A protein has these predicted regions:
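C-terminal regulatory or interaction extensions
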Residues: 1-163
Length: 163
C-alpha cells in the first residue's frame, strides 16, 4: 500500500481471475474457496464479489474517479484517486468512471441517462454538456452504448458494451 497526495495504490501478487472490464458484474472466483469461506464465516471478509460495487458507491458519494485497476503478468494494482475538482480529472479517469458507473447501474437495474451521470460526477444541470462530452468519449472508446438507438436525444439511456 502506497499513499500519495492525490492517490492511494494497493498492489497484490497475482493477476485478476476475471476480466478487468467485467469486474463489477462477473461472478467472483476464489483461488482458495475453503479459506475464503472460512474468512467470511469469521467476518474477516464479506460476501464474494461485493467489493467493487461497494467501492463504486463510496466513490460516487465522494464524487471522485472510479478505481483504476492494472494487471501485469504476476500482479494487480488498484489506484484510488482523490481529485477535488472535475477539471483536475484526466480524460481516462472520466471515461473509466462513466463506464464503471454504467456497469454498476446496469447490474442494479438503474437506467443511466445524462442526469444520472451528472449526479455521479457532481455536475450541475446547467453544465450538462460536460457530461454529454464524457458520454460521447466513453461511447467512442467502445465501453458503453445506447440501450435504444431509435429514441430522441433527451430520452437516451446507456448500457455497458457487453449488455
Amino acid at each position: 500500500m502506497e499513499i500519495f497526495d492525490t492517490k492511494i495504490e494497493a498492489s497484490n501478487p497475482g493477476t485478476l481471475l476475471v476480466d478487468v472490464n467485467r469486474i463489477i458484474d462477473t461472478a467472483p472466483h476464489s483461488r482458495n474457496e475453503a479459506i475464503a469461506s472460512f474468512l467470511r464465516i469469521v467476518r474477516i471478509c464479506e460476501e464474494r464479489g461485493s467489493g467493487f460495487d461497494r467501492m463504486e458507491e463510496g466513490m460516487r458519494d465522494l464524487t471522485i474517479p472510479a478505481p483504476k485497476v492494472e494487471c501485469g503478468d504476476d500482479f494487480t494494482r488498484t489506484k484510488l484517486y482523490w481529485y477535488a475538482n472535475l477539471n483536475d480529472w484526466k480524460r481516462e479517469d472520466k471515461i473509466r468512471t462513466c463506464y464503471l458507473y454504467t456497469c454498476y447501474c446496469y447490474v442494479n437495474e438503474i437506467e443511466v441517462a445524462n442526469a444520472v451521470l451528472r449526479e455521479r460526477f457532481g455536475v450541475e444541470e446547467k453544465n450538462k454538456a460536460i457530461i454529454s462530452r464524457i458520454i460521447k468519449d466513453t461511447m467512442n472508446a467502445g465501453l458503453i452504448k445506447l440501450s435504444d438507438v431509435n429514441v430522441a436525444p433527451k430520452l437516451r439511456r446507456y448500457i455497458p458494451y457487453w449488455a
